Amino acid sequence: MDNSTDFNSLRGLSVFLLGMMGSGKSTLGELLSRRLQYRFFDTDILIERVAGKKIREIFVDEGEATFRELETQVLAELSSLTKTVIATGGGMVLKPMNWSYLRHGLMIWLDVPLEILVKRLKQDTSRPLLQSTDLDSKLELLLEQRRGLYAEADLRIVVSDLDTPTDIVEKILTAIPTVIKDFHPERDHN
């Protein structure tokens, strides 16, 4: 698929990648932004810049509620941009206010099976919500809490263990034109 077709079909609309931690939002966001010739932002990195500390430190020092507030502030700023791919935090969908910002763009859910998430996150010590707990059970609980919210996305991309990041980006680029025609004019930001 050629880049100009992808770019034109989006008409400058930003793309929000949604999904669980470990679903590949940051990696895929960078690749997708290059293919679309868009800018790329990762909300977790921006939150760390705004707070002047790592996410884990925000959770420890100030709690999850403060982190979620920072997350909303960053999302509010990003939602006004066009031609941008945004990797969101896994819990971005939990706060109702965030949906008003997410609806400014095309929301894509990276639906990764629990077994793959567990495999990817087993050695990751940087995720505050996974500390001092049974990884499988915690991820299963988080996924159950969030699955219905993720399903509100405009597009669902099912990821398998065999998919490379490039394969997944190709799935996204192929699927975008199937949902763009269904957008309401008030959602199309040129």
Swiss-Prot record:
Residues the record lists as binding substrate: 44, 68, 90, 146
Catalytic activity: shikimate + ATP = 3-phosphoshikimate + ADP + H(+)
CDD domains: SK
A cellular component annotation (GO) from this entry: cytosol
Entry keyword set: Amino-acid biosynthesis, Aromatic amino acid biosynthesis, ATP-binding, Cytoplasm, Kinase, Magnesium, Metal-binding, Nucleotide-binding, Transferase
Protein name (Swiss-Prot/TrEMBL): Shikimate kinase
GO molecular function, one term: magnesium ion binding
Enzyme Commission code: 2.7.1.71
Pathway membership, UniProt: Metabolic intermediate biosynthesis; chorismate biosynthesis; chorismate from D-erythrose 4-phosphate and phosphoenolpyruvate: step 5/7
Co-factor note (free text): Binds 1 Mg(2+) ion per subunit.
Principal location listed in the UniProt entry: cytoplasm
Residues bound to ATP: 22-27, 127
Subcellular location: Cytoplasm
